């Protein structure tokens, strides 16, 4: 994998992924930024949340579950020191579908956390306390 990050101005950077997609990142005003893009640590949370959600949806589809939506809420706690690394990250999957089997949703969440989500597993190995749970909403 490769990525290129180019400084634009102030605390704003543009990142271009190896697959050619771009994203603007910026810092808060109190750090010289103008809040024109996501912050790098927010990008990590977006990455881990998307990686896990991708797994959960794919596993549920392969389990023949009629999943119609998956919203992943990610909450993190950072240490109160420099560097302000993540101490804890919690992922809550709000899964919607028709007659979803809770055991299969639990299995999908567990497999993502323990076997498939590279981002989540990497952060866990680095010492971040990773937790996951889910709720199910019946689709109309």
Report residues per predicted region:
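Extended beta-strand/beta-hairpin segments
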Residues: 1-46, 57-140
């Amino acid at each position: 994998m490769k990525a290129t990050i180019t400084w634009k101005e102030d605390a704003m950077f543009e990142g271009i992924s190896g697959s050619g997609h771009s994203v603007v990142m910026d810092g808060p005003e109190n750090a010289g930024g103008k809040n024109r893009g996501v912050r790098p640590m927010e990008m990590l949370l977006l990455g881990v949340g998307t990686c896990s959600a991708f797994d959960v949806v794919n596993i549920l589809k392969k389990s023949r579950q009629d999943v119609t939506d998956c919203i992943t809420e990610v909450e993190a706690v950072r240490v109160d020191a420099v560097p302000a690394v993540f101490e804890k990250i919690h992922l809550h999957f709000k899964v919607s579908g028709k007659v979803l089997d809770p055991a299969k949703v639990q299995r999908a969440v567990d497999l993502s956390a323990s076997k498939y989500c590279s981002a989540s597993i990497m952060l866990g190995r680095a010492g971040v306390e990773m937790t996951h749970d889910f709720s199910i909403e019946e689709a109309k």
